[in-house]
Structure formats: C-alpha cells, structure tokens
Amino acid sequence: MESKSSSSSLPLFALFNFFLISFCRWVSSTRIFLSRFVPLLQHHQRVFDKKNNKDQQETLTKQEDDDDDDDDDDDDDDDDIDISREEAEMVMRSLGLFYNDDQLQEQYSAKEVSSLFEEKEASLEEVKQAFDVFDENKDGFIDAIELQRVLTILGFKQGSYLDNCLVMIRSLDGNKDGKIDFNEFVKFMETSFY
C-alpha cells in the first residue's frame, strides 16, 4: 500500500519540481530580458542629452551629423553613460519590485547595471527571497494554499487544484507537519539545482 502511495506522489513531485524549475527559469529569463534594456536606457539618455543641447545641434553641419551617428555606434561599448535614480525607480516599479529609498544610488553606470544580470549561483538570501514569494502570510511555512496561489499566478493549471498542491507538499515535507519550512525548501533547492 505504501509503495502505491509513494509511486502516485512521484509524478506530482516531478510536477512540482517542473513548476519550481520553470519559475526559476522565468526569473532568470526576466533578468536576461531586463539586461537588454541597458542599450535602450543608454539611447534614451543620449536623446535626452541631445534635446538639452538643442542650440548646439542646430549649428552642426551635415558632415558632423554623419560623424556623430558613427560615434554613437562606437559609444555602445563605453561605460560613461549613466542611468539616473528616477529611471531605475521607473523600471523597478514597472516590474513590481519594491525598494527602500536608501537602497538606490543617484546614478548607475552601464557597467553596474550590466553586472546585475550576470549568471551566478544563488545565495542563501536569494533562496530566502524565493521562499518568501511562496510564503504569503510570512509565517515561515509554505502550505498548500500558498503553493496553489503561486502556481495559479504562474498559470499552471495543475496547481489550481488544492489536492495536487497537498501531494506536492507531502512529497517535500520531511517532518510531516503538512507544510514546507525554510530548511525543507533549501534542501529541495539544493537537490534540484546543484
């Protein structure tokens, strides 16, 4: 009888594993997607600077305009273009990311922004942030309802059924309390990704 219940929870564990991996890949793709905004923000800064120097632009000859266009192509590799605090706030708000005012610098160089999106091993703090995405009521546990909420938000139909979520929780629940605590979550993350 036990082998039957463990074999029926195996596909659900695999499903949960798939959902979690998909979620992490989504986060990674979002980071990569956002890294593509750096050139856009650089271009925006150039356009803004050009508008402020309108008088100077009017005095340029056609030859100088062509040279400037060529120089703009060369400037793509330069790190001298900054992103303002307001631009960083706008991007973070549009992504639904929250921040404290003291966490943001007045300006960021293109190199600093680019380094935010480099691939690196997840730190314990990043794993905690991922755990907090699931732990809506902040009680230190992920229960089936919280898991269901996240999987539904991510668009997984199987996650919309509470019974499926209960089976997923049971498959990871080492102490059999019906919830996943942070240590169980870390253990799952270590076995899934490392």
Swiss-Prot record:
Residues 52-63 have a biased composition (Basic and acidic residues). Disulfide bonds: none annotated. Residues 52-81 are annotated as: Disordered. Ca(2+) 2 binds at D173, N175, D177, K179, E184. Residues 64-81 have a biased composition (Acidic residues). Ca(2+) 1 binds at D135, N137, D139, E146. GO terms for molecular function: calcium ion binding. InterPro entries: EF-hand-dom_pair, EF_Hand_1_Ca_BS, EF_hand_dom, EF_hand_pair_protein_CML-like, S100/CaBP7/8-like_CS. Residues 76-98, 122-157, 160-194 form the EF-hand domain. Keywords: Calcium, Metal-binding, Repeat. SUPFAM superfamilies: EF-hand. Potential calcium sensor. This is Probable calcium-binding protein CML45. It comes from Arabidopsis thaliana (Mouse-ear cress). The lineage of its organism: Eukaryota, Viridiplantae, Streptophyta, Embryophyta, Tracheophyta.
